[in-house]
Amino acid sequence: MPRRKKKGKEASGAQNLEKKDAETASSVSVKKKRRIEDGFIVISDSDGEEPKEENGLQKTKIKQSSRAKCLAKRKIAQMTEEEQFALALKMSEQEAREVNSQEEEEEELLRKAIAESLNSCRPSDASATRSRPLATGPSSESHQEKSTDSGTTEGIWQLVPPSLFKGSHISQGNESEEREEPWDHNENTEEEPVSVSSGSWDQSSQPVFENENVKCFDRCTGHLAEHTQCGKPQNECGRGSAFLKAVQGSGDTSRHCLPTLADAKGLQDTGGTVNYFWGIPFCPDGVDPNQYTKVILCQLEVYQKSLKMAQRQLLNKKGFGEPVLPRPPSLIQNECGQGEQASEKNEGISEDMGDEDKEERQESRASVWRAKTKDFQEGPIKTLKEKLLLEEEPTTSHGQSSQGLFVEETSEEGNSVPASQSIAALTGKRSSVLMPESSAEEITVCPETQLSSPETFDLEKEGFPDSRETLYEVSIMADKEVDNREDAKKEIHTSTFSSSTQVSCPLCDQGFPPTKIERHAMYCNGLMGGDTVLTRRQKEAKNKSDNGIAAQTSLDIDKNEKCYLCKSLVPFREYQCHVESCLQLARVDQGDGPEESGRLCLAVDGKRPQQLKNLKEKDRSEGRLISLLEQSEYKTTDAEIKTKFSETGDFRVPSAGVEEAGCSREMQSSLAHLDLNESPIKSFVSVSEAADCLVDFKKQLTARPGSRTRTKAGRGRRRKS
């Protein structure tokens, strides 16, 4: 019994040894296959398909390398610095050699693969064009052909999808065996003439090339060159050779091997197929071709953007030149001197040179002022009278004609400078009298925006052609000019330039001296009678001053009332009687003439002979005023308006209350044609003047200041809109 057991143990041990030998032989064959596969370039388009055995080998290699690194680190830690340096040099040399050897090996492999692909593509080889002898009879020549062209057949075999086999009842495991069997056959060509596996491979490969499957196979993989031909030569090469030729630089052959998108989709639907990607040159192994193309597109986009940026930097903008000034350089130098003087005064710079310059300027200005005052005292009134009669322009009670307009007219008609100087002096006096001292420093108020005081009204009323030559008027004007010498200096200094040079505003077409055109242009909004635009701080100060002026005018109105017809101030007690007399005079003027109207006016008012002359002139204008009121606003002409205003120089524009009552709508429309700096708020008239109206406004006298503020607010809204 024990002998039998020993025999059974020996038999089982022999079986185990045989199994081990078979396993080792299979492992050796697998290793040899791997070596052969490494020797040839297998071209396949599968994405990331790697056998499991290679992964295992890679893991073992990684473990071994990690162990070696740990040992090397321990050794390096025990070595000195010199030894470490020498070791580093040796390691770098070895790495360089390995890199060079790898490159050389890769080049050799590429050369071999290219040579084999070229040999496989030759249709002249008689042995390559016949695939039947492989199945009919074993021969050493056919096996040698297989061994020489095994690389290309392996590449083509991997490209064939399993679903294309007509009679493919073979499992995927059998397919893998069949793929391995040709390599086993190649190993044993010398020992065994024909193996069973080779016959099975031939039998399984025969249905591939029958009938229509050959065409489909050719569309998917290009075609099968020599090994897979049924007696019909093909001139085109397979896909593997096409790729290798593309590597060499012949990109035209790869176009013949490109499958259509529909074929690729059909292959994907059948299952177990290979995904093909075309059009990406030299895509790295293991990289998604779609992402690789995105990277290429991004690089192109970055290149285009950088090119555009470089082109933009080449463009250089032309620099701005010198500003174009609207005046000659002499005026600029004069203004620069004035600006320096003002800055010295404000900052309080106490320097010797600065004091000398100031004294020289003051002396020069004083000499100019003395010469101008002499000229002014000789004949300012006659020149003013002649100018007003010739020009026939309106002069309102609060100095409506600005300095710029007078200067323009004098330059056109050739009148002398003292006339403009006298007007400048009068306007300077009015602005200084009406504005408070506190707000005079902060804001610059135009004289047109202020109401006239009784003194200036009497002065202008008495300063008409018949009464201007009186000595009383000359003395008043001289006193005012002496009191306001500094203001008059400034006005006369600017008027010396204005007669020769006059700059017109491009927005409102008004003429201004060169020293004032810039300030006007800053605030000009295109309106003919636009006031200077003020800041919030200036508006607040102006509102305060307007409130004080409104209080003063209310006191003045309590004393005197202005007649709307004759534009004269009348005591409040005599106002009603005066208005009735004016109305009677207007009616009589239409029928009998101005002489009877003058008598009635003398009888009712009892004025002095000085007012008789003014009333005669007013009576002439009253007839025209009523005729204008009777006419429609569209039929009035500019000639009638000019004559009317030349004879009645003290007219004011009607107030808002009178306009509501309908007493002067035609008058307002006729005044709209004139380029006057007028508005209802500038020449405010009390409600009691509207005697002919249907509405009784006397009950609303207490609401006068409020109405003034409302109209100002309304004007502000209109300007904003």
Swiss-Prot record:
<protein>
    <recommendedName>
        <fullName>BRCA1-A complex subunit RAP80</fullName>
    </recommendedName>
</protein>
<feature type="cross-link" description="Glycyl lysine isopeptide (Lys-Gly) (interchain with G-Cter in SUMO2)">
    <location>
        <position position="31"/>
    </location>
</feature>
<feature type="modified residue" description="Phosphoserine">
    <location>
        <position position="140"/>
    </location>
</feature>
<feature type="modified residue" description="Phosphoserine">
    <location>
        <position position="679"/>
    </location>
</feature>
<feature type="binding site">
    <location>
        <position position="524"/>
    </location>
    <ligand>
        <name>Zn(2+)</name>
    </ligand>
</feature>
<feature type="binding site">
    <location>
        <position position="520"/>
    </location>
    <ligand>
        <name>Zn(2+)</name>
    </ligand>
</feature>
<feature type="cross-link" description="Glycyl lysine isopeptide (Lys-Gly) (interchain with G-Cter in SUMO2)">
    <location>
        <position position="635"/>
    </location>
</feature>
<feature type="cross-link" description="Glycyl lysine isopeptide (Lys-Gly) (interchain with G-Cter in SUMO2)">
    <location>
        <position position="698"/>
    </location>
</feature>
<feature type="cross-link" description="Glycyl lysine isopeptide (Lys-Gly) (interchain with G-Cter in SUMO2)">
    <location>
        <position position="429"/>
    </location>
</feature>
<dbReference type="GO" id="GO:0003677">
    <property type="term" value="F:DNA binding"/>
</dbReference>
<dbReference type="InterPro" id="IPR006642">
    <property type="entry name" value="Rad18_UBZ4"/>
</dbReference>
<feature type="cross-link" description="Glycyl lysine isopeptide (Lys-Gly) (interchain with G-Cter in SUMO2)">
    <location>
        <position position="387"/>
    </location>
</feature>
<keyword id="KW-0234">DNA repair</keyword>
<keyword id="KW-0677">Repeat</keyword>
<feature type="domain" description="UIM 2">
    <location>
        <begin position="105"/>
        <end position="124"/>
    </location>
</feature>
<feature type="region of interest" description="Disordered">
    <location>
        <begin position="391"/>
        <end position="418"/>
    </location>
</feature>
<feature type="region of interest" description="AIR">
    <location>
        <begin position="270"/>
        <end position="400"/>
    </location>
</feature>
<feature type="cross-link" description="Glycyl lysine isopeptide (Lys-Gly) (interchain with G-Cter in SUMO2)">
    <location>
        <position position="699"/>
    </location>
</feature>
<keyword id="KW-0227">DNA damage</keyword>
<dbReference type="GO" id="GO:0008270">
    <property type="term" value="F:zinc ion binding"/>
</dbReference>
<comment type="subunit">
    <text>Component of the ARISC complex, at least composed of UIMC1/RAP80, ABRAXAS1, BRCC3/BRCC36, BABAM2 and BABAM1/NBA1. Component of the BRCA1-A complex, at least composed of the BRCA1, BARD1, UIMC1/RAP80, ABRAXAS1, BRCC3/BRCC36, BABAM2 and BABAM1/NBA1. In the BRCA1-A complex, interacts directly with ABRAXAS1. Interacts with UBE2I. Interacts with NR6A1. Interacts with ESR1. Interacts with TSP57. Interacts with TRAIP.</text>
</comment>
<feature type="modified residue" description="Phosphoserine">
    <location>
        <position position="101"/>
    </location>
</feature>
<feature type="modified residue" description="Phosphoserine">
    <location>
        <position position="467"/>
    </location>
</feature>
<dbReference type="Pfam" id="PF18282">
    <property type="entry name" value="RAP80_UIM"/>
</dbReference>
<keyword id="KW-0805">Transcription regulation</keyword>
<dbReference type="GO" id="GO:0042393">
    <property type="term" value="F:histone binding"/>
</dbReference>
<feature type="region of interest" description="Zinc-finger-like region">
    <location>
        <begin position="505"/>
        <end position="582"/>
    </location>
</feature>
<feature type="cross-link" description="Glycyl lysine isopeptide (Lys-Gly) (interchain with G-Cter in SUMO2)">
    <location>
        <position position="90"/>
    </location>
</feature>
<keyword id="KW-0479">Metal-binding</keyword>
<feature type="compositionally biased region" description="Low complexity">
    <location>
        <begin position="194"/>
        <end position="204"/>
    </location>
</feature>
<feature type="region of interest" description="Necessary for interaction with NR6A1 C-terminus">
    <location>
        <begin position="400"/>
        <end position="500"/>
    </location>
</feature>
<feature type="zinc finger region" description="UBZ4-type">
    <location>
        <begin position="502"/>
        <end position="529"/>
    </location>
</feature>
<dbReference type="InterPro" id="IPR003903">
    <property type="entry name" value="UIM_dom"/>
</dbReference>
<keyword id="KW-1017">Isopeptide bond</keyword>
<feature type="cross-link" description="Glycyl lysine isopeptide (Lys-Gly) (interchain with G-Cter in SUMO2)">
    <location>
        <position position="559"/>
    </location>
</feature>
<feature type="binding site">
    <location>
        <position position="508"/>
    </location>
    <ligand>
        <name>Zn(2+)</name>
    </ligand>
</feature>
<keyword id="KW-0832">Ubl conjugation</keyword>
<keyword id="KW-0156">Chromatin regulator</keyword>
<feature type="region of interest" description="UIM-linker">
    <location>
        <begin position="97"/>
        <end position="103"/>
    </location>
</feature>
<dbReference type="GO" id="GO:0070530">
    <property type="term" value="F:K63-linked polyubiquitin modification-dependent protein binding"/>
</dbReference>
<feature type="cross-link" description="Glycyl lysine isopeptide (Lys-Gly) (interchain with G-Cter in SUMO2)">
    <location>
        <position position="642"/>
    </location>
</feature>
<keyword id="KW-0862">Zinc</keyword>
